[in-house]
């Protein structure tokens, strides 16, 4: 089971950590390290594949890319990689892949804390004509992401809640 595999892989670390959101935490969920194990990545991909509703998926570079690839292969859905920053060369696009007008896209993330990364991806998709109604993460830290996203008309779904890991 995924929860046990995450714990056994050492993906749950205890100590003093600063999260992407800038918040301090007594624990850290290192999904990126965990999904370097193909068994765990496959489990994550299978779980999320069953939760995807839209015809396309998207996520922020770097953390969600392996998950996007796994889910894309399993569901045969195309994906979009959202860049964290403006590209200074080439096309200068904020994303890789295509976003079509009025196309519904589910966002996938590894860990949701405040929902900031998911919201940033949603804004880029929406600003380019796409529709975002759902986000799916491996772990919801239960620190406000679901509430903030709901205020922006996005439902958050997760495989695991942080309270299940402690």
Curated annotation (Swiss-Prot):
- According to its UniProt record, in which pathway does this protein act? Pyrimidine metabolism; UMP biosynthesis via de novo pathway; UMP from orotate: step 1/2
Chain sites annotated for binding 5-phospho-alpha-D-ribose 1-diphosphate: 83-84, 89, 109-117
Task: Give the enzyme's EC designation.
Answer: 2.4.2.10
Annotated GO biological process: 'de novo' UMP biosynthetic process; pyrimidine nucleobase biosynthetic process
Q: Which UniProt keywords apply?
A: Glycosyltransferase, Magnesium, Pyrimidine biosynthesis, Transferase
> Which reaction(s) are listed as its catalytic activity?
orotidine 5'-phosphate + diphosphate = orotate + 5-phospho-alpha-D-ribose 1-diphosphate
Among its keywords, does the record have Magnesium? yes
The protein's enzyme class: transferase
**Which cofactors are named for this entry?**
Mg(2+)
Cited NCBIfam families: pyrE
Q: Which PANTHER family match?
A: OROTATE PHOSPHORIBOSYLTRANSFERASE, URIDINE 5'-MONOPHOSPHATE SYNTHASE
Question: What does the similarity note say?
Answer: Belongs to the purine/pyrimidine phosphoribosyltransferase family. PyrE subfamily.
What role is this protein assigned? Answer: Catalyzes the transfer of a ribosyl phosphate group from 5-phosphoribose 1-diphosphate to orotate, leading to the formation of orotidine monophosphate (OMP).
User: How does the annotation summarize its subunit structure?
Assistant: Homodimer.
Q: What is this protein called?
A: Orotate phosphoribosyltransferase
Give the organism, scientific name.
Picrophilus torridus (strain ATCC 700027 / DSM 9790 / JCM 10055 / NBRC 100828 / KAW 2/3)
